[in-house]
C-alpha cells in the first residue's frame, strides 16, 4: 500500500449553533454531521472543487482519518432530518498546521452563516494515500492508538463483604472509631475495620460476620433477614432525644466522635445509646438489646442445627455418649499448639513445620525448608504496588528462580490475604500443566511474603511485541493454542484467571509460553453460586459484564484472550479511550476495527471472542460456533501434540545463559536488587500474627 506523508485524524466533539438557526424542536445535540472531501482540479483552464468520494456520516466523538493533499478541502455540513443547517469549509493543510507535533489538539471550526464546531485533531504520518477511499480508513477510537507502547497495571476495586444487606469494605479511619457491634475501640495503623458503604456502620473485621440486623440503607430483604425476624421478632425502636454530652462520646452507629459543645447528638432515653443526628434514621430497632450476645446466641443455634443435620448417626452418638473423651490424650501436644493463639515469629515456626512434615509426609523425613538467606538477590525483573519480582540464585546450586516479594502491610491494608493464599494454591496446582508457571517454594519474614517460582528467561510477550510491533498469524496461532490449553486447565479446576495480558504470558528458553501472576485468580470456593463479582483486571482487557457490575464466570478469560489475540495480530489494542471512562464506553459499545491484513478466519475468531453475551462467547458451551478448539482459525491443529508440548515453537528467544535477563525491561534490570525495609516498627507490631499461618511450602513436584 502506498503511503502519504501527512494525514489528519479528526473527532467532532460538539457544535455551538445559535438558536435562531435551528429548526423547530431541534437542539444542537440533534444535529448530525456529514463530511465531504473535495479536491481542486483544472477544467478548461479553470480551478474547480470536485467531490470524488462518497459523503461520510461520522458519529459525534468518534475518530476518522483522511489523507492530506495539496488543495484538498474538508466540508462539514450539520443536518437535521437530511436538511442542512450550517456548514464549514476548511483546507486540510490549515487543520494540520494547527496541530502540535504528534499531540492531540482541540480547534474551533467556524460555520456559516453562524456558529462553530469543536473538533479534536491529530497530525498523522505515513498514512494510506489517496488511492483508498476515505470511508475505507474511517475508524473509531478502537483504531486510534499508535501501537502497544506501555505496560498496563491491573486494577482491583475494594472487596465488598455483603452481610445482611450491608456492604462492608476495609477502611482506614483517620480518627478514633468504636465498633458498633461490640463497642470496643478499633486499633491499628492501617485499615482498622470495616465500614458499610450504604449506612456507614463501622465494625471490627472480626465482628462484621456477626452483624444480625438488616442494613437500613439497603433495599434488600433476604431470606436470612426474614428468618431472623420470624425467630427473634427484634423490632424495638429507640426513643431518641437531643442531648448535651459533657464528655467525649462516640456514635454507636458509625463509631466516630460526636463533635460540638452543645447538643452534639441524640441519646436514647431507655438504653442510653448515642448517635449523630444524621445517623438516627440508620439506627437499628434494637433498644435495650445487646447485639453481641444476641449474635453469639443466633450463631450458636445455627451451628447446632447444622451440626445435628450433617453428623452421621454414629458420630452423633459418640458426642452424646462422651466416648470421644477416650481419645483426649492421643492428640500430640505439639499439634494442639497449632490451634492455640500465640505470637507468630518466623523462627518459632521452623520446628512446627518440620513436625508437620513428618506427620503428613508419612514419616519419610522433613521436606527441605527455604528462607531468604538461602538465596542471592541478582536483578529486579518487575515492580508493582505489591512489591517486586527479582531474579535470585539458590546458593551453592547454580539454580536461578524468580522471587515475588509481597509486602505484608500492603496485603493486609488491601484485604488481600485470601487472594495471596489463592495464588499460592494455583501455583502449586501449576505443576500439573506445562503452560503454567510453577512454584518452587514459599516462605515469609516478618515484613514480606515470598513466592519462589521457575525463572522464565525468555521474557514476556509485551517485551517481544514491542520489538517487532506485531506477530504473524502462524506465531499468533501457536501462542493462542498453548494459552487455550492453559485456560481450559484452569477452568476445569474451577479457577478464573482474570488477568490474562501480554505482560503475564512469558516464554521459556525453548519458546513455549507459560502463564504467570495468579494474584487476581478466583476459585469456586470463594464464589457465589459459581459466579464472581469483584471489579478487577487490567482496563484494556476487562470484559463488558465486569464493567456493568454483573456476576461473571470463566467467560471473562475468553474476552481477555480475544484482546490478547487482537494485540498480537494487529499490534495495538482493540478498544481505546483517553481515560478509563472512555475506554470502558468503547468496550461496551464499539465494534473493533479489523484491518485487511488479518485473515477472515482470524477476524471471525476475534468477533466470536468479542461477543458481549458471555453465554454465547467463543470458548463457552453455548457458543453457536461450537467449541473453541474446532473453530476454523485453529483448523489443522493437533491439540494432543500441543497438550504434550510436542509442537516446535516458531520463535526461540535469544538467551545467553541461565541467568540472562536481557529479555526483560532495562528500566527494571538496571535497578539494585534489594528489599525495601519497613522502618515503622509500630506498623509491624499491628500485623495480625495469625494472618499468614502455614504460608511456607516447598513443592515436592517441582520440575525444571
Swiss-Prot record:
Which InterPro entries does the record cross-reference, listed alphabetically?
A: AGC-kinase_C, C1-like_sf, C2_domain_sf, DAG/PE-bd, Kinase-like_dom_sf, PE/DAG-bd, Pkinase_C, Prot_kin_PKC_delta
Which keywords annotate this record? ATP-binding, Kinase, Metal-binding, Nucleotide-binding, Phosphoprotein, Repeat, Serine/threonine-protein kinase, Transferase, Zinc, Zinc-finger
Q: What is its EC number?
A: 2.7.11.13
| SMART domains in the record | C1, S_TK_X, S_TKc
Looking at the keywords, is Protein transport present? no
An example Gene Ontology molecular-function term:
ATP binding
The record ties this protein, via SUPFAM superfamilies, to: C2 domain (Calcium/lipid-binding domain, CaLB), Cysteine-rich domain, Protein kinase-like (PK-like)
* Ranges where the AGC-kinase C-terminal domain occurs: 635-704
CDD domains (alphabetical): C1_nPKC_theta-like_rpt1 (cd20834), C1_nPKC_theta-like_rpt2 (cd20837), STKc_nPKC_theta_like (cd05592)
> In the UniProt record, does the keyword Protein biosynthesis occur?
no
Q: What is known to happen upon mutating residue 544 to S?
A: In k501; normal up-regulation of nlp-29 upon D.coniospora infection or physical injury
Which stretches make up the Protein kinase domain?
375-634
Reactions catalysed, semicolon-separated, are: L-seryl-[protein] + ATP = O-phospho-L-seryl-[protein] + ADP + H(+); L-threonyl-[protein] + ATP = O-phospho-L-threonyl-[protein] + ADP + H(+)
Q: What happens when the gene is disrupted?
A: Up-regulation of nlp-29 is severely impaired in the hyp7 and vulva epidermal cells following fungal infection by D.coniospora or physical injury.
- ZnF Phorbol-ester/DAG-type residues are 165-215, 237-287
Full protein name = Protein kinase C-like 1
The species is Caenorhabditis elegans
